[in-house]
């Protein structure tokens, strides 16, 4: 026993705890040292009062639902259409120096891979200025009450990012930053299959017919991503693995457009059949009821409640059958297995988490409530009689005196 404990303690020393953080900015190594942090949009923080070579992205609030952008002159800022809250400058002269235009980014590929075309507003000025960008855009197709938050990425050219949610790209800037669309791989690569010792074709778990593509971010620049709920960062080292819900996976670091199939594989939890034991298999003796013990129900409400009860059971049966059929055809859980080294961005709420079914409580019937209130309480007495061939027979009566008189007349 002591030897087993010693071996277990030695094994635990090689396990690295997985750290999940929630930073507002995901900074990659070797970042430029001239990027400073800002707390809010104030007069002393405006870029025209200090030396600013690159734009600054800073998420504000808890949760971070607003993105503050400080931009130097002649640097274009791209934000999603209808998400701009305000534009601020040190004096009134900045209004005449700002120019804006609407641009479509890969409209054909976005329509084919994602089923929609998103518009971005390009803002550029000859003087420094500041922007406030909202995490939600006023689009009729994307109108929702879900809480969203920002996470900013700093790309220095050493790593690329695959954004799996096509509506996550809210703002970006960078002279060499490239935003392109690629098809999500359906199966894993041969390299990953040989590493995992898989012989047959295995799916990545990311491919869906209603969402065929992802956005690839390459080059140098800054990006503001939007996720449902809060956004968390997971850093996986070499040969580390983690199971992630596909709907909650917002973005992942990759090395080129064809690296996504080298790190993700579909995972299905093993389904165990329920044990069929002998517990509860003993047959109970049926209860015999006398005709006098059964009270006939002639009330309409009684039969109506029976019909509603059976209808409720039928509806629940069809819902359960639909859920079991979906789990059988699609899978019991929608998880993917991610293999490091990778950086992951997770959103706490999935896209379809708001459409949860809730069972409604039955509304009380006022007529039944009034009838129960107006109904007078009455006492029922139980008595027993000895009948030949039947033995002791228990009965109930509201009037004990009348029952005694009936028994005396019957015996006489």
Curated annotation (Swiss-Prot):
Presequence range in chain numbering: 1-25
Q: Which UniProt keywords apply?
A: Mitochondrion, Transit peptide
Major site of localization recorded for this protein: mitochondrion
Q: Which Gene3D superfamilies match?
A: Mitochondrial biogenesis AIM24
Q: According to the UniProt record, which cysteines are disulfide-bonded?
A: none
Please, which domain of life does this record's source organism belong to?
Answer: Eukaryota
Q: Where in the cell is it found?
A: Mitochondrion
List the coiled-coil residues. none
- Please name the GO terms of the biological process aspect recorded for this protein, alphabetically: inner mitochondrial membrane organization
Which named protein is this? Altered inheritance of mitochondria protein 24, mitochondrial
* Similarity-based family: Belongs to the AIM24 family.
Taxonomic source organism: Debaryomyces hansenii (strain ATCC 36239 / CBS 767 / BCRC 21394 / JCM 1990 / NBRC 0083 / IGC 2968) (Yeast)
Read off the InterPro entries from this record.
Answer: AIM24, AIM24_sf
GO CC annotation: what is one?
Answer: mitochondrial inner membrane
């Amino acid at each position: 026993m002591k030897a087993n404990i010693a071996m277990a303690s030695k094994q635990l020393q090689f396990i690295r705890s997985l750290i999940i953080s929630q930073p507002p900015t995901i900074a990659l190594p070797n970042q430029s040292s001239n990027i400073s942090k800002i707390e809010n949009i104030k007069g002393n923080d405006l870029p025209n009062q200090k030396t600013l070579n690159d734009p600054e992205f800073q998420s504000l609030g808890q949760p971070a639902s607003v993105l503050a952008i400080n931009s130097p002159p002649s640097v274009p800022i791209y934000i999603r259409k209808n998400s701009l809250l305000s534009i601020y400058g040190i004096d009134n002269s900045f209004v005449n120096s700002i120019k804006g235009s609407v641009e479509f980014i890969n409209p054909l590929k976005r329509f084919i891979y994602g089923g929609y075309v998103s518009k971005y507003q390009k803002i550029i000025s000859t003087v420094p200025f500041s922007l406030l960008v909202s995490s939600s855009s006023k689009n009729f197709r994307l109108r929702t009450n879900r809480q969203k938050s920002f996470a900013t990425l700093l790309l220095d050219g050493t790593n690329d990012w695959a954004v799996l949610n096509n509506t996550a790209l809210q703002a970006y800037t960078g002279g060499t930053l490239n935003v392109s669309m690629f098809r999500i791989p359906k199966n894993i690569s041969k390299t990953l299959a040989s590493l995992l010792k898989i012989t047959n074709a295995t799916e990545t778990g990311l491919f869906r017919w209603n969402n065929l593509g992802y956005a690839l971010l390459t080059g140098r620049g800054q990006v503001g991503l939007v996720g449902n709920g809060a956004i968390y960062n997971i850093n996986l080292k070499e040969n580390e693995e983690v199971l992630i819900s596909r709907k909650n996976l917002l973005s992942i670091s990759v090395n080129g457009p064809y690296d996504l199939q080298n790190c993700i594989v579909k995972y299905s939890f093993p389904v165990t059949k329920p044990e069929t034991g002998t517990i509860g298999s003993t047959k109970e003796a049926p209860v015999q009821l006398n005709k006098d013990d059964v009270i006939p129900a002639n009330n309409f409400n009684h039969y109506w409640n029976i019909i509603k009860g059976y209808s409720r059971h039928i509806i629940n049966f069809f819902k359960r059958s639909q859920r079991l059929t979906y789990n059988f055809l699609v899978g019991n859980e929608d998880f993917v297995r991610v293999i490091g080294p990778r950086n992951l961005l997770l959103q706490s709420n999935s896209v379809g988490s708001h459409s949860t079914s809730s069972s409604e409580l039955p509304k009380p019937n006022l007529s039944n409530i009034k009838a129960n209130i107006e109904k007078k309480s009455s006492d029922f007495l139980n008595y027993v009689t000895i009948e030949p061939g039947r033995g002791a027979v228990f009965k109930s009566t509201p009037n004990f005196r009348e029952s005694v008189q009936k028994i005396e007349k019957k015996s006489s």
